[in-house]
């Protein structure tokens, strides 16, 4: 694990603006000085539709993904919809992640959404309304060039449901049933 005080997760086909890390770190430090429960920050994301051909990526379009999210703390209502906050748009205080992440399978295509629900049950996440992350969607449907989660959508749905059910059965997360 990183020696840093912060942690980001990056999908292999997603990308960040050059100022992503410095901007999120700066804003998170300012927010934490006022709201100590905020231990992570997520920025707006742009969806990039692309095709992979041989050694080239052809971008077909770029459009806002979650620009409807306002500055401030994320509410549970927002994360009711899967992928409203992509994994690669978040920066976490590492210490706030350690206990939460242990009960989630990092290699699962369904890792982030159940993890994020569990994380939000214990911490606040701040939205920075600046598009600094890019959520790439490969329009290819083959395993070599396509998106793993899209290609394995059935496995994603199954693992998501199992992770959600496990959280709902947990005494610690029973408040999520209300």
Predicted regions mapped to residue ranges:
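Hydrophobic helical membrane-anchoring modules
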Residues: 139, 143-177
């Amino acid at each position: 694990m990183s020696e840093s005080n912060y942690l980001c997760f990056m999908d292999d086909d997603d990308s960040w603006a050059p100022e992503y890390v410095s901007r999120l770190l700066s804003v998170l430090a300012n927010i934490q000085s006022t709201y100590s429960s905020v231990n992570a920050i997520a920025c707006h994301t742009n969806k990039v539709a692309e095709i992979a051909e041989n050694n080239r990526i052809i971008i077909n379009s770029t459009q806002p993904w979650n620009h409807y999210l306002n500055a401030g703390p994320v509410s549970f209502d927002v994360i009711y919809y899967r992928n409203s906050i992509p994994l690669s748009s978040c920066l976490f205080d590492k210490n706030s992640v350690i206990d939460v992440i242990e009960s989630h399978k990092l290699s699962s295509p369904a890792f982030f959404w159940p993890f994020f629900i569990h994380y939000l049950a214990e911490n606040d996440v701040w939205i920075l309304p600046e598009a600094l992350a890019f959520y790439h969607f490969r329009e290819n449907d083959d395993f070599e060039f396509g998106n793993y989660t899209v290609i394995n959508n059935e496995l994603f749905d199954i693992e998501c449901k199992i992770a959600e059910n496990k959280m709902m059965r947990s005494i610690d997360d029973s408040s999520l049933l209300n």
